[in-house]
């Protein structure tokens, strides 16, 4: 972990001092890191690609609205992202080099880059269907359009 990553992480309400920060996953949009703390908890640190998401405030407000709704509807707390706030209560950090956010890491979870079996396809469909069902009553008009005309 370099000094810059450490300085970024110290701005968030983590359970303890960051002990490690390593690149994580194969994302194509944001830069993602797995963070472990001295307290044993893990987090996901992401540098948001503000060239793709020009309205970072709107993006983060969308995430807050959707995760709050899902948390009220879902019987499984592991199925909903937990956003970690900055020490001044914000959902993301604006630094000299861009925008950063932190989520609690979901232990024993996986993220497939490509389904390998029929079961992978099935579980992906179940997850997506459950997500859609839980959002059925969500007031979509509250969401910001963070990438203009993306859905057109």
Regions flagged by a language model, labelled:
Residues 1-22:
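Juxta-kinase regulatory segment immediately upstream of eukaryotic protein kinase catalytic domains
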Residues 20-43, 47-152:
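Conserved ATP-binding subdomain of kinase catalytic cores across diverse folds
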């Amino acid at each position: 972990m370099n000094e810059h990553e450490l300085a970024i992480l110290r701005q968030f309400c983590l359970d303890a001092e960051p002990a490690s920060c390593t690149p994580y996953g194969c994302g194509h949009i944001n830069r993602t890191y797995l963070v472990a703390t001295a307290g044993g908890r893990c987090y996901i640190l992401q540098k948001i690609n503000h060239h793709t998401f020009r309205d970072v405030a709107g993006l983060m407000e969308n995430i807050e609205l959707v995760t709050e709704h899902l948390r009220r509807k879902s019987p499984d707390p592991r199925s909903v992202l937990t956003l970690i706030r900055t020490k001044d209560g914000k959902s993301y950090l604006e630094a000299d080099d861009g925008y950063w956010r932190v989520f609690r890491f979901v232990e024993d979870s996986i993220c497939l880059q490509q389904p390998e079996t029929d079961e992978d396809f099935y579980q992906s469909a179940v997850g997506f269907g459950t997500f859609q069902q839980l959002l059925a009553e969500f007031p979509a008009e509250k969401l910001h359009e963070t990438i203009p005309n993306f859905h057109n």
